[in-house]
Amino acid sequence: MLNGPSLERELVLTELGQQIQNDYDLLVDDPSLYCVPASTSRVWANPNVRIVFEQLPDQVLISYEFYDLRRVIPLGDESALQDRPSTTNIKGTYFQEMGSSFARYEGDRLIIESRNHAPGYIRTSRGVPQGENTVTLEELWIEDGELRIVHTYIDDTLYEVPFVLDYSFARIEEGELPLYECTDADYDWFYELNNIEEEVSQ
């Protein structure tokens, strides 16, 4: 489970990246409204949900409580990359926003490389974009009993320098993942809050 908020390093957007961010409307463009993961980063950064890892001889399985997502990631080099997305929900719906992935070990670290993303958002709170040319690297290792992840987004059409995020996760002893069973969301609460604030200010 996520152990504290994720941290991000310097974000320097290109002109195109800045334009996409400027055009972003949380109440319209957030894929979460439709139970769609906006990006792998958005899934890692979600608090209070569980994640299960399973190592098989030829692949790594990552199951997320969030949106009931399941990632099947083959071990190997670039030739292991498949055309279809690596992530589905338990109903079998594919999510290209999470990309197509392959993985390898470098010492005690698992490196997951993902490509072929659908356009989405790394940070839905403020519309930090990813695009179809985006390549990501997730570096996972255990340190001091915690899972650490460094997540790097590379796309010179969107970022002047790679955008890097850091996460840490605490191990918990739990049984099977509960079902998330997402239903289409809305931001009625946001509108109601704004109406209340406007009334107070009048």
Please describe what each predicted stretch is:
Residues 1-202:
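PEST-like low-complexity, intrinsically disordered acidic/proline/serine-rich tracts
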